[in-house]
Amino acid sequence: MAVKKFKPTSPGIRQMTVASFDEITKTKPEKSLLEPLKKKAGRNNQGKLTVRHQGGGHKRMYRVIDFKRIKDGIPAKVASIEYDPNRTSRIALLHYADGEKRYIIAPNGLNVGDTVVSGPDADIKTGNCLPLKNIPVGTLIHCIEMRPGKGGQLVRSAGAAAQLMAKEGEHATLRLPSGEMRKVLAECRATIGQMGNLEHENITIGKAGRKRWLGIRPTVRGVVMNPVDHPHGGGEGRSPIGRKAPVTPWGKVAIGGKTRRKKASDKLIIKRRTK
């Protein structure tokens, strides 16, 4: 995939870059694998705002993705590589030998006509899915389960890859894209290869309107609000925040404070992410 630039015919176009979509082979999605996607606008089931800066955006349909890959031993042919508006990576449509169709997230190097398979006896080949205990140490992997049978949860965004560092007993040690070193049960499955759409990190949004197309609303600084809206608000003219340290809209320290809950899985983290 390449990044496409434009002639600077307007201030918005001047900085904007988009993906070339060279790898896309089909524009209309598989109808049987579509579901309606209702907009949440950052609200919970009570209608209360729980996530700020969300709302609007282009209408989307959800593509049902197979994250579990439990059709063991049945080969599937890659029929197409498609765009998915709900994620940064591309998706691949698989036609299984028994006639079933499923989507998977597309790793780098997976092309139309390739054959993929899942199961403990699968080859170490891009797109194949197998338990961590059957994958050689040093292999790049993605779409990793955290619990056996739950489906891939880790390393699913464009260009991401984890590395299998060691296998010891019932656990495998992974190095995640964040730099975190973590143990995962060796029975958990992962897919071989690095995530596709590598150039995604080089895309420049270019203008505010494009953020709105994505369903992202403006992020307003607290210092320009009124005191009723934010602890940083108020004052005459351009005033400082009036506190020793910046805080969130709810008064908690914004910089340096730990936000991660204590979990039973903390003991599986060998080294925290690099900041």
Curated annotation (Swiss-Prot):
Annotated GO MF terms: rRNA binding; structural constituent of ribosome; transferase activity
SUPFAM superfamilies on file: Nucleic acid-binding proteins, Translation proteins SH3-like domain
GO biological process: cytoplasmic translation
Pfam families given in the database record: Ribosomal_L2, Ribosomal_L2_C
Annotated Gene Ontology cellular component terms: large ribosomal subunit
Keywords assigned: Ribonucleoprotein, Ribosomal protein, RNA-binding, rRNA-binding
Lipid biosynthesis keyword on record: no
InterPro entries reported for this sequence: NA-bd_OB-fold, Rib_uL2_dom2, Ribosomal_uL2, Ribosomal_uL2_bac/org-type, Ribosomal_uL2_C, Ribosomal_uL2_CS, Ribosomal_uL2_dom3, Ribosomal_uL2_RNA-bd_dom
Keyword set includes Transmembrane helix: no
Ranges for region Disordered: 224-251
Function: One of the primary rRNA binding proteins. Required for association of the 30S and 50S subunits to form the 70S ribosome, for tRNA binding and peptide bond formation. It has been suggested to have peptidyltransferase activity; this is somewhat controversial. Makes several contacts with the 16S rRNA in the 70S ribosome.
NCBIfam families attached to this UniProt entry: rplB_bact (TIGR01171)
Family: Belongs to the universal ribosomal protein uL2 family.
Complexes and interactors: Part of the 50S ribosomal subunit. Forms a bridge to the 30S subunit in the 70S ribosome.
Name of this chain's protein: Large ribosomal subunit protein uL2
